[in-house]
């Protein structure tokens, strides 16, 4: 027993010896910490509660009527109806005097602070009647105005920053297009290279390491490129892609530019939902913010073609905001019970939306003119399961793809709905004709894809079974029903990509990586059928001269890169790039030439052919000369390296002879070599003869 205790004691002493004295984590005397809390814990401090938390959603309404208790309920109903247009009201307090008479002001608490701010903007100085005009303020404004210093200090003068030319990329006399290539070099670290597509080989303009965390995106006119980072996003531009503006929105997942590049919308998650912020690109100022319950169709904003309006869909309504104030159009939403989707015309301030079937009332597609809110065309539809709105790029036509059913099956509680006997209609709206006539095309097969010709009057569809589908081309003309002009049968394709200039189309199977180039003006012949295994993207350049197919590392990890083709499908460049992420052509702004001037140039184009061909020959000759000079320089460099190594090899001969037993192995004759032939059995075959 004593022996056991002594063993335990020795074991405890050994364990105690393993634990040394704890280190001292205190700062040494005279230590000065140069790192502020904001730099060290900026992301956490941004979420700490402020003193105003809890009252920032409260508004104070002054100059309301002073009424007796008998009339108080009526006053409450009037004011609540007015203020509830801007959000959900949680609580209302009407202070009263000893006699029960209101004191002429009230406190209202909204569910969200943004709703309170909206109510202040819209209802401050609102005239209730000839004797009462509201004075509406945020509750937090009282403390803000109390802390205003009595002595005014002039603002500091900021130095003027000279900005580079943002449109230098269109000043190239030969109008070569630019593109960017992104490749991931490390987790959350993407390298981006910018290139100019010159002949005979593209020219590298700029390469940026660690340029973005995920991917990049061009603005609609090609002026800016946006990068994504943990604190927010940044836009770059100019000749060397300098930083133009940054927008602090942590965790931004997606951005969207307005068509004229005046505004930027950022979408990023928050602990309470999805935060959406609209920014002014030139000033970097936040114009408006929203909180949504997640990334859904309801949270997406859609812009008018001229940046004058931005709209989003709400529950049974459309919210249209005017720029630059971002107030609701006419200070109220457009109530549309049963709305399921909407889309702006790409060239006019016209909104198309569709409404689902309700209580034996048919579904409806409506065209509404903004800002007048005037309905210019309606189309009733029956037995509708879903609709998709497809505008032609020129705004000449609108196609509504209608998924229709023959029979509807519901369960007892109407929770599960099944559509049986599906077929499809294409409702074509002729936007440029009087009273906007509508034509209909019915297809009894499954529709896999739809695409308008950007410039022209044709559209194409993929229909049938997935593995053996058909591609049909229709032509739309004035006064006649859309006609089928060509059907290509048994085509294994999943997507359709029209050239931005029309005429040529790529039928792609992005599952197998096969492509077919079709000329729609030459009896729809297939000019080429290349393949690019595992290709996941197709990009036309803005002029319609080149097509790029890419295999992204987002899809696979091996053999990533991109191929470049002519518009007829001839391969001109293959690039294998490790961890390739994306390829994007730089968009071009619209031409400044009038339609008459463009027609004149096209008419006299033959006059310019000789000059263009001569310039191309000179460029190719110059390029060939430069290539020969480059090869000659490489050969000279190699021969210099080779001669240097031969000299080193000769200097080491004595050392080699000594190490090899005084045998000069550099000049061995074949007679001194013994050759031995060895045979061994590889396999044995037995053949039976009858």
From Swiss-Prot:
Domain RRM as annotated: residue spans: 57-141
Signal peptide range in chain numbering: none
Chief place of localization: cytoplasm
Region Disordered, residue ranges: 1-37
GO cellular component terms attached to this protein's record: eukaryotic 43S preinitiation complex; eukaryotic 48S preinitiation complex; eukaryotic translation initiation factor 3 complex
Protein origin, superkingdom: Eukaryota
Protein localization: Cytoplasm
Keyword terms, alphabetized: Coiled coil, Cytoplasm, Initiation factor, Protein biosynthesis, Repeat, RNA-binding, WD repeat
Coiled coil: 595-645
WD repeats: 207-246, 293-331, 334-369, 442-484, 530-575
An annotated GO BP: follicle cell of egg chamber development
Pfam families named in the record: eIF2A, RRM_1
Biased composition (Acidic residues): 15-25
Gene Ontology MF terms in the entry: RNA binding; translation initiation factor activity; translation initiation factor binding
UniProt entry tagged with the keyword Iron: no
Subunit field text: Component of the eukaryotic translation initiation factor 3 (eIF-3) complex. The eIF-3 complex interacts with pix. Interacts with mxt.
Recorded family membership: Belongs to the eIF-3 subunit B family.
Purpose of the protein: RNA-binding component of the eukaryotic translation initiation factor 3 (eIF-3) complex, which is involved in protein synthesis of a specialized repertoire of mRNAs and, together with other initiation factors, stimulates binding of mRNA and methionyl-tRNAi to the 40S ribosome. The eIF-3 complex specifically targets and initiates translation of a subset of mRNAs involved in cell proliferation.
Annotated protein name in UniProt: Eukaryotic translation initiation factor 3 subunit B
Origin species: Drosophila sechellia (Fruit fly)
Highest classification ranks of the organism: Eukaryota, Metazoa, Ecdysozoa, Arthropoda, Hexapoda
